[in-house]
Amino acid sequence: MRILLPLLILISISSRAQTLRAGEAISLIQHRYAGTPPLNTVDTIKAGDPNTLVTGITTTFLDTMEVLRAAVRRGDNLIITHEPTFYNHLDNTKFFTDDPVYKEKLAFIEQHHLVVFRLHDEIHADTTDHILKGIYEELGWDKYPHPPGPRGQYFVTVPQVTLAELARSLQSKLHVQTLRVEGDPNLSISHVAFLPGSSGLEKQVLALRQPGIEVLIAGEASEWETVEYVRDAVAQGKNKALILLGHQVSEEPGMERCAKDLRELFPGIRVDHIVAGQPLWNPEHGPVANSPQ
């Protein structure tokens, strides 16, 4: 019976694909990523009516205006975003009540009857951090060994390489427009801590403190916190380095992986992944066109 249950669920979902409501779909997605979110989880509906019939699903790192427009063009009305819709972690809109940018974005969502759900805490908190796994797969690092234990997945042993070589490889494979590096370019690297997104000073420093770790790869970090910690560590002769990919670069592959999961979960419903793109550009090369189609 335990083997048949997932199959029966899939058959049920497929048979009622035309009558699946957003709230029901969201509940199934949360069940798929069975992580335990914090009590004050941000994994909630940010806009829209949960009773809306689902016509298609879009996953994305962040539901920018361009992502929302692309979703509408594709006929998708359930948006699964990893990061906030309204510019702050809790999506608190009190400050933006009379803001023209906020008002236009909200009006667009309402006009097109979109439902926006944030999938952040649960997709990270599952036994496997699916956002981390996504970028490991993108880099081909899923084959490399990790230490045992629940936090072991955030540490990986890679073939020996210099810091400069590692940075160039990451920039090339991930098409990073504004990659930043701190540390000795010739530092030998084989033990890596990888914290996608913006995990904050304490988690980043704790990762750097782990025995043998030479470099932390992160999405972003406060320049006056982790960045200065690494600067002092290097000045003290410690073999430490920092690579900042950019928040979107570090987490978009995980949400693309999410889209693959949802295609299996909802076999009768269109599921797209729409890349949010990198918001910042390097004046040496100019902005790269990465707007969603």
Report the location of each language-model feature.
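Sec/Tat signal peptide C-region and signal peptidase I cleavage site
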Residues: 13-17
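Sec-dependent N-terminal signal peptides
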Residues: 3-12
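Active-site catalytic microenvironments in core metabolic enzymes, especially phosphate/sugar-handling
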Residues: 18-293
